[in-house]
């Protein structure tokens, strides 16, 4: 191990550390960071060399953050990245600084939005917030209105997580939806992602995603928002149902074919009792 450590350059060590951090399961960033910190044993090197990994993790995970003085959380995403560590809260029309390591928002300031698309963005946000409140107990959504390649574009992001470290599992749902505002009809493009980590007496991860495409009729802002939510709800319901059914099937067939739930005797072995019997027998023989 010492020989291998001597062969690795600082650049290579940081590259490996960054990979660990970027692939940290949801809700386990701090644990992975602390482990990597111990392995690297160089805080300055880790902070300077792996800073991009901290940022990439938060962007990929749609990390929610609360801004002091404002009621609703906002998501950290690439669509709200203003550069130089600043991000956009489109609902409150503010920019703020975000510390990717501490996951803290500071220095909120007024920020002018894309006025030409703001009425569309607001309509979609209102409809999406109602949908998220109904379907996601811990859900957060952020809706952006941007001009991309000359086209007015709506981007809607949803994040919901459950972190149950005491029960040895953590999970996160993310979905991203886009459509351009064009006459008559437009195409909605979405991607749905689920990541769950279960680590009691083992280490199992579910990482799944699905791409979605559908047509959306564009009329006025409010009606278009309603039709958009119908597409989102149908696709996300179908995806969640498919995931649940698939894993129920695997539990009933594949997993059972791989391993018996009970030994051939149909009785679970109490290893603690066996150990105590063995110790007692050895003491008698002594």
Swiss-Prot record:
InterPro entries: CapZ_alpha, CapZ_alpha/beta, CapZ_alpha/beta_2, CapZ_alpha_1, F-actin_cap_asu_CS
Modified residues (N-acetylalanine): 2
Gene Ontology process terms (BP): actin cytoskeleton organization; barbed-end actin filament capping
Transmembrane portions of the chain: none
Any Pfam family the entry gives: F-actin_cap_A
Domain of life, source organism: Eukaryota
CC annotations in GO: cortical cytoskeleton; F-actin capping protein complex
Modified residues (Phosphoserine): 9
Gene3D superfamilies: F-actin capping protein, alpha subunit, F-actin capping protein, beta subunit
Keywords: Acetylation, Actin capping, Actin-binding, Phosphoprotein
Tagged with keyword Ribonucleoprotein: no
Entry's Gene Ontology molecular function annotations: actin filament binding
Function: F-actin-capping proteins bind in a Ca(2+)-independent manner to the fast growing ends of actin filaments (barbed end) thereby blocking the exchange of subunits at these ends. Unlike other capping proteins (such as gelsolin and severin), these proteins do not sever actin filaments.
Assembly: Component of the F-actin capping complex, composed of a heterodimer of an alpha and a beta subunit. Component of the WASH complex, composed of F-actin-capping protein subunit alpha (CAPZA1, CAPZA2 or CAPZA3), F-actin-capping protein subunit beta (CAPZB), WASHC1, WASHC2, WASHC3, WASHC4 and WASHC5. Interacts with RCSD1/CAPZIP. Directly interacts with CRACD; this interaction decreases binding to actin.
Family: Belongs to the F-actin-capping protein alpha subunit family.
Name of the protein this chain belongs to: F-actin-capping protein subunit alpha-2
Originating species: Bos taurus (Bovine)
High-level lineage: Eukaryota, Metazoa, Chordata, Craniata, Vertebrata
């Amino acid at each position: 191990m010492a020989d291998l450590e001597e062969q690795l350059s600082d650049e290579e060590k940081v590259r490996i550390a960054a990979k660990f951090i970027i692939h940290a399961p949801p809700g386990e960033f701090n644990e992975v960071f602390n482990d990597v910190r111990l392995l690297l044993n160089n805080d300055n090197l880790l902070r300077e060399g792996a800073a991009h990994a901290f940022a990439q993790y938060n962007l990929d995970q749609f990390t929610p953050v609360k801004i002091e003085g404002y009621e609703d959380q906002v998501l950290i995403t690439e669509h709200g990245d203003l550069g130089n560590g600043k991000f956009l809260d489109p609902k409150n029309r503010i920019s703020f600084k975000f510390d990717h390591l501490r996951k803290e928002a500071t220095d909120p300031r007024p920020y002018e939005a894309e006025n030409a698309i703001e009425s569309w963005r607001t309509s979609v946000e209102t409809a999406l917030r109602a949908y998220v409140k109904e379907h996601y107990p811990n859900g957060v959504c952020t809706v952006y209105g941007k001009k991309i390649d000359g086209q007015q574009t709506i981007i809607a992001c949803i994040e919901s997580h459950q972190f149950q470290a005491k029960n040895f599992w953590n999970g996160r749902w993310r979905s991203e939806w886009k459509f351009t505002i064009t006459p008559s009809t437009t195409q909605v493009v979405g991607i749905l992602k689920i990541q769950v980590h279960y680590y009691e007496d083992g280490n199992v991860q579910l990482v799944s995603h699905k791409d979605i495409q559908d047509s959306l009729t564009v009329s006025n802002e409010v009606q278009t928002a309603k039709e958009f939510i119908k597409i989102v709800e149908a696709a996300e319901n179908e995806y969640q149902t498919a995931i649940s059914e698939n894993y129920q099937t695997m539990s009933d067939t594949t997993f059972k074919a791989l391993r018996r739930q009970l030994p051939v005797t149909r009785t679970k072995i109490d290893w603690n009792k066996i150990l105590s019997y063995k110790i007692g027998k050895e003491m008698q023989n002594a």
